[in-house]
Each structure stands twice: as structure tokens, then as C-alpha cells.
């Protein structure tokens, strides 16, 4: 009986609607910039916690996302789709960018929320 229930559950999970398609070809400008954990980290230069967002890529210390599209979600958030690349793997996926504090703080969600970043001057 448990096997039947598990198969039904998996069947229902496979019926989930796909996410809506991206409506933009690039990351919205409000997210573009260099972001770090603190202004002191910004002054120190690019370190392990720096996130750099451009119109066509998002750079993390250990990976790179080549942007293929974006879908705004309200005034302060967007899903950014693209091709991820690390030293050991490549895959297609998405991240969510969320602005807070009047655009001064960036939250990046990629399965889990990263430490919030402040916008570097």
C-alpha cells in the first residue's frame, strides 16, 4: 500500500505547472552592481562573499551564472534564469534576487537564502 501511495504522490508532483517563462532578456538594472556583506568588505575589494550582478551575468566566489532571461516579481524581486558554471559542474537553473532597504540590500535565494549583501558604492 505504501508503494502505491508513493507512486501517486510522485505522479502528482510531476503534474506541477512549469514556472512562467522569462519576460526579459537581461537582469533588471535595479539589481546591477557589486554587493558584499558590509561596506568594510566593499572597501577591502572583491573577496569570498562578493556578488557581482551585471545585465548578463551574476558572479559568485565559486560560480558564475550566464543570464538567459529574467522575470520580475513585483517591484523588488526577480527570478533570473541562466546557465551555471563552477570548476566541477555546469547546469541550467535560476536564482531569485530580492531588494530590501530601499534597494540598498540584496538577498540572493538559490535554494536557500544567502547572507544579505549591501550595495557597494
Over which residues does each language-model region extend?
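Beta-sheet ligand-binding and adhesion/scaffold domains
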Residues: 40-41, 81-121
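Bacterial signal peptide processing site
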Residues: 15-18
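Short, intrinsically disordered, charge-biased short linear motifs at domain edges
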Residues: 2, 27-30, 105-109
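Short, solvent-exposed coil/turn segments at beta-strand boundaries
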Residues: 30-34, 50-58, 73-76, 97-105, ...
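N-terminal glycine/threonine-rich, aromatic-flanked beta-hairpin/loop signature
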Residues: 41-86
Amino acid at each position: 500500500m505504501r508503494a502505491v501511495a508513493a507512486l501517486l504522490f510522485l505522479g502528482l508532483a510531476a503534474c506541477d505547472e512549469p514556472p512562467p517563462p522569462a519576460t526579459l532578456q537581461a537582469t533588471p538594472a535595479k539589481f546591477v552592481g557589486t554587493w558584499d556583506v558590509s561596506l568594510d568588505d566593499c572597501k577591502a575589494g572583491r573577496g569570498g562573499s562578493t556578488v557581482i550582478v551585471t545585465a548578463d551575468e551574476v558572479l559568485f566566489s565559486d560560480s558564475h551564472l550566464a543570464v538567459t532571461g529574467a522575470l520580475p516579481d513585483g517591484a523588488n524581486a526577480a527570478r533570473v534564469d541562466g546557465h551555471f558554471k563552477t570548476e566541477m559542474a555546469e547546469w541550467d537553473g535560476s536564482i531569485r534576487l530580492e531588494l530590501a532597504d530601499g534597494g540598498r540590500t540584496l538577498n540572493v535565494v538559490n535554494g536557500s537564502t544567502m547572507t544579505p549583501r549591501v550595495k557597494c558604492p
